[in-house]
């Protein structure tokens, strides 16, 4: 005679299910037609329940009670005379309570064949729409669709608040062909905590955070969080339309790099982060008043270690909890756009950390990383390198980039550590790396990925800016992909940065012997579309602040810094400056503390801040400073060889009819009276800016706001003038308004 168990569970399926070894649970649990086709059978597994009834969702009536097959929690039963499947819920009685749930095992697969194909191919741009935790409506029932990629796992369950973290309750459906696991759970609340519980090929169990989670717990906790259903209502249409038609390589771009956790803090002891609403009220007006065109946010994907500054993210899709939720971040970006400020996001695609709840050996195998440490481990940071040749990994990264640009309206990505992606021998000794298929050192898979990424993003999101932090001489970083380039819009000019900061640190007496450090960058300025960056990396790890790098007394330090900024803003290329540098922060940056805003009580710091503000105003108002940034016609040296005086003079040109600007940079404390410079034409030239003005806390030497050029050729120009060059200064001269009008006529 058959027992209850083998009436409903054949071939030992009940034992396998109880032991967590039955992977095809959807073929067993839920509603199924009997073998003879004459009845419906419902099976479920509910620990600690003692009675289960099946209730029709359509009319709310009880259809049948299920038999308790064993004390472990297996229930099963037939649905009377019904032979047509119907939607149902389970009324479950526990010793002290009764609940009703919609049985998740009655639903079929929800994954789309096209999505699966693109994901495996490596070209899925919206993988976050079907992977992770997404709200879905299935046959009129609302719930959360969980999906994860784990092709080598023997079993995957979703565990969380909603099932008491029981790995046997919600075993997921496996798609053998592509390694995806899914389940639709109607009985989950927004804000619920969850993880994926995986049985590895060796039989070990590990709980992992959702790689596609859009919200995560605060460290040291690491559960993923079911997202809210509410959506942000965008109000940035004007900006998005303007962005789409803006040629940024011809437009002014002055980027303010920000670490949100330390720009400013609140609380009695500065122990609290500003939230997004605080940042809307404080950061945006400040950036606007200072004249910056963009904000660049250091990484905001969830990261457990504060000291990584976000460059070792574990939750690549989850905005960090530190400043608020996803809707708060969207509101911040929206407010920036309404203030006519763009927002660029630092994006980390070069490596990921080894935190055990993260991507490392996700399903018990090297899924996201390479198996061989010679390709899969980063020696500098002890992190793991993505396997860029694997389609699913490419889709994971491509979709993440699209996620930030599409869902959060970011205006571009600054990709961190591109150099480490491009070379297989990056930071490795001989014997520690594997050559490519042609015997070379280039990482062909990473190069292919970056080309694909840039091509697709520029096509999908008009007007964005893709920026590379790339420190080598790799050719074609900003060349179009159809010309065999990487396809970036801009590349950080690390050579200019290193040379110019080295020059800055030298005593003025010896700068004459290092004159080339400020002129050499113009030898290669047009080989890429460069961005001049003085980033956070230059004011940490014992390097000191910019002010600290400069020798001399305080007066010389401040004057030199103002002159340096003048040179930077006059030099071809877009601009990026790290927060605090705009008012000459004295101490190097500390991510644990706010910037030293109290310094603005002192005039020298006010002077530097005002100088940057006026430089930005001139930069945005004079097209000669941006429209021909990447064409040799936009720049001309007047004298690049005056090393003995450490004076640099050059002209910036715009399009026909645009007024040129003349820059005079003096990097010694000497004053030069009767100093002749060439000028584009005879007539009146305004002294637009003078960094030595009393307005900037200088010594107030100069030309009283006006220079008159005579018809005396000089330095290849048809006219010239005798001027006073103040100490450690930057002068910017431009045609007076009447001269500009005359020239246009």
Swiss-Prot record:
GO terms for biological process: glycogen biosynthetic process. This is 1,4-alpha-glucan branching enzyme GlgB. Belongs to the glycosyl hydrolase 13 family. GlgB subfamily. InterPro entries: A-amylase/branching_C, Branching_enzy, GlgB, GlgB_N, GlgB_N_E_set_prok, Glyco_hydro_13_cat_dom, Glyco_hydro_13_N, Glyco_hydro_b. One of its GO terms (cellular component) is cytosol. The gene is glgB. Monomer. It catalyses: Transfers a segment of a (1->4)-alpha-D-glucan chain to a primary hydroxy group in a similar glucan chain. One of its GO terms (molecular function) is hydrolase activity, hydrolyzing O-glycosyl compounds. Transmembrane segments: none annotated. The keyword Glycosyltransferase applies. Pfam families: Alpha-amylase, Alpha-amylase_C, CBM_48, GlgB_N. Pathway: Glycan biosynthesis; glycogen biosynthesis.
């Amino acid at each position: 005679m058959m027992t209850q168990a083998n009436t409903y569970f054949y071939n030992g399926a009940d034992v396998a299910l109880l032991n967590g070894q039955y992977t095809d649970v959807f073929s067993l649990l839920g509603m199924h037609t009997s073998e003879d086709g004459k009845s419906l059978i419902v099976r479920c597994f509910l620990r600690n329940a003692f009675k289960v009834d099946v209730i029709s969702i359509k009319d709310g009536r009880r259809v049948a009670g299920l038999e308790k097959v064993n004390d472990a929690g297996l229930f099963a039963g037939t649905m009377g005379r019904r032979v047509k499947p119907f939607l149902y819920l389970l009324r479950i009685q526990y010793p002290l309570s009764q609940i009703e749930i919609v049985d998740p095992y009655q639903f079929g697969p929800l994954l789309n064949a096209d999505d699966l194909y693109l994901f495996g191919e490596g070209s899925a741009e919206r993988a976050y729409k079907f992977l992770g935790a997404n709200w879905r409506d299935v046959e009129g029932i609302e719930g959360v669709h969980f999906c994860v990629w784990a092709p080598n796992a023997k079993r995957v369950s979703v565990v969380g608040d909603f099932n008491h973290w029981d790995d046997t309750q919600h075993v997921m459906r496996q798609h053998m062909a592509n390694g995806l696991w899914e389940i639709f759970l109607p009985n989950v609340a927004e804000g619920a905590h969850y993880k994926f519980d995986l049985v590895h090929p060796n039989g070990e169990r590990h709980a992992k955070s959702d790689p596609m989670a859009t919200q995560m717990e605060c460290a040291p906790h690491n559960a993923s969080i079911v997202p809210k259903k509410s959506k942000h209502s965008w109000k940035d249409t004007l900006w998005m339309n303007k962005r789409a038609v803006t040629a940024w390589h011809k437009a002014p771009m002055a980027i303010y790099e920000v670490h949100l956790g330390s720009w400013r803090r609140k609380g009695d002891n500065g122990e609290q982060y500003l939230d997004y609403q605080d940042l809307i009220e404080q950061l945006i007006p400040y950036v606007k008043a200072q004249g910056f065109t963009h904000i660049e946010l250091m990484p905001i994907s969830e990261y457990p270690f504060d000291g990584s500054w976000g460059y070792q993210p574990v939750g690549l899709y989850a905005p960090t909890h530190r400043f608020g939720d996803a809707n708060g971040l969207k509101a911040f970006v929206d407010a920036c756009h309404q203030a006519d400020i763009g927002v660029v996001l630092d994006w980390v695609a070069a490596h990921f950390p080894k935190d055990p709840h993260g991507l490392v050996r996700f399903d018990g195998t090297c899924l996201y990383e390479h198996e061989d440490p010679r390709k899969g481990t980063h020696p500098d940071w002890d992190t793991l390198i993505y396997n860029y040749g694997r389609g699913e990994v490419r889709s994971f990264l491509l979709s993440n980039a699209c996620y930030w640009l599409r869902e959060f309206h970011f205006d571009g990505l600054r990709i961190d550590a591109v150099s480490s992606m491009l070379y297989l021998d990056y930071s490795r000794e001989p014997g520690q790396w594997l050559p490519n298929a042609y015997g070379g050192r280039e990482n062909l898979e990473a190069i292919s990925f970056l080309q694909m990424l840039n091509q697709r993003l520029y096509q999908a999101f008009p007007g964005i800016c893709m920026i590379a932090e790339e420190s080598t001489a790799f050719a074609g970083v900003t060349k179009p992909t159809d010309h065999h380039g990487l396809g970036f819009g801009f590349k950080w000019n690390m050579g200019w940065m290193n040379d110019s900061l080295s020059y800055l640190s030298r005593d003025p007496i010896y700068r004459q012997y290092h004159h080339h450090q400020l002129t050499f960058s113009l030898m290669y300025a047009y080989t890429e579309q460069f961005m001049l960056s003085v980033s956070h990396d230059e004011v940490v790890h014992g390097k000191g602040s910019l002010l600290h790098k400069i020798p001399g007394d305080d007066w010389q330090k401040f004057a030199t810094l103002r002159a340096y900024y003048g040179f930077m803003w006059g030099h071809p290329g877009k601009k990026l400056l790290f927060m605090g540098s705009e008012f000459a922060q004295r101490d190097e940056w500390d991510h644990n503390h706010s910037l030293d805003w109290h310094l603005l009580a002192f005039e020298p710091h006010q002077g530097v801040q005002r100088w940057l503000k006026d430089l930005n105003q001139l930069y945005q108002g004079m097209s000669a400073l941006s429209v021909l940034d990447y064409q040799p016609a936009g720049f001309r040296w007047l004298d690049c060889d005056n090393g003995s005086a450490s004076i640099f003079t050059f002209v910036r040109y715009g399009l026909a009819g645009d007024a040129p600007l003349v820059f005079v940079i003096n990097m010694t404390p000497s004053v030069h009276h009767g100093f002749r410079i060439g000028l584009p034409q005879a007539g009146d030239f305004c002294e637009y800016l003078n960094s030595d003005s009393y307005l900037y806390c200088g010594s107030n030497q100069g030309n009283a706001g006006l220079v008159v050029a005579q018809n005396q050729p000089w330095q290849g120009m048809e006219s010239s003038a005798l001027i006073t060059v103040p100490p450690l200064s930057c002068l910017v001269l431009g045609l007076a308004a009447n001269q500009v009008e005359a020239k246009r006529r």
